[in-house]
């Protein structure tokens, strides 16, 4: 049985309406190979993974907390108020944006890129939670209101 993304978005919307927030997305790290994946509406941590929590690693906030601005109806996300390094050994792997309707956008980054991305909220309003994952210092987040 396949479940459409519309099902997840509808379910997330219903959860958010009841709870008043963004509660659908969780981010997990594979314990064997270190890969990071997101999951929607997951109550159980997948086998071989652990759920990541924002800010659980002690590191420089100025290089890790996503900075979010709205420019020309787009969300510009820059990782850190001081630019984060993007080296082979230390870089930002992903930036996620979770909108109040439960929709999630993701940008994958690689060493050598700038630690930033521009997302199109497509007219969405409400609370937006932005996450980023540093391969050395874990998951970080910030929230804004659109």
Region roles according to the model:
Residues 121-126:
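Surface-exposed, short loops/turns at beta-strand junctions within beta-sandwich domains
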Residues 3, 7-14, 21:
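Short, positively charged and aromatic/hydrophobic N-terminal segments
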Residues 135-142:
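Short acidic/polar inter-strand loop motif in beta-rich domains
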Residues 37-74:
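Transition segment at domain starts
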Residues 91-101:
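Extended low-complexity, serine/threonine- and proline-enriched intrinsically disordered segments
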Residues 115-119:
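Short strand-edge motifs at loop-to-beta-strand transitions and within beta-strands
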Residues 8, 21-51:
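Long, contiguous interaction/targeting segments characteristic
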Residues 79-87:
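Short amphipathic, basic-aromatic surface patches that mediate peripheral association
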